[in-house]
């Protein structure tokens, strides 16, 4: 039930803010983005696990200022595999 509530909240946020977000925002988004990090482990794997799944030794979140959506994706981070 808690998962369903989180998914409904996530969908509602996307519907409300979707109008303010350009399609290019997706290029800046990652599993490390602070605004959606609460869904890590529920809807997607964390950075380290995803990189291992892709055949890398691991991964970590690094600062990556948003190029396309600086007003929406503040303090943006992206997953970098090593």
Curated annotation (Swiss-Prot):
Which terms under GO biological process does the entry name? defense response
Q: List the disulfide bonds.
A: 25-32, 47-51, 61-69, 79-81
Q: Does the keyword Secreted belong to this entry? A: yes
Pfam families, per database record:
Macin
Q: Which GO terms describe its cellular component?
A: extracellular region
Predominant subcellular localization, coarse grouping: secreted
InterPro entries referenced in this protein's UniProt entry, alphabetically: Macin, Macin_sf
Q: Tell me where the signal peptide lies.
A: 1-23
Give UniProt keywords alphabetically.
Antimicrobial, Disulfide bond, Secreted, Signal
Protein's UniProt keywords contain Cell wall biogenesis/degradation: no
User: Where is the protein localized?
Assistant: Secreted
User: Which family does the UniProt entry place this protein in?
Assistant: Belongs to the macin family.
Q: By what name is this protein known?
A: Neuromacin
């Amino acid at each position: 039930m808690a998962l369903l509530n989180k998914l409904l909240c996530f969908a509602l946020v996307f519907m409300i803010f979707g109008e303010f977000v350009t399609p290019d925002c997706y290029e800046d988004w990652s599993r490390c983005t602070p605004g959606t990090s609460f869904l890590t482990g529920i809807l997607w794997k964390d950075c380290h696990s995803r990189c291992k799944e892709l055949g890398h030794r691991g991964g970590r979140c690094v600062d990556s200022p948003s190029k396309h959506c600086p007003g929406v994706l503040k303090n943006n981070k992206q997953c970098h595999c090593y």
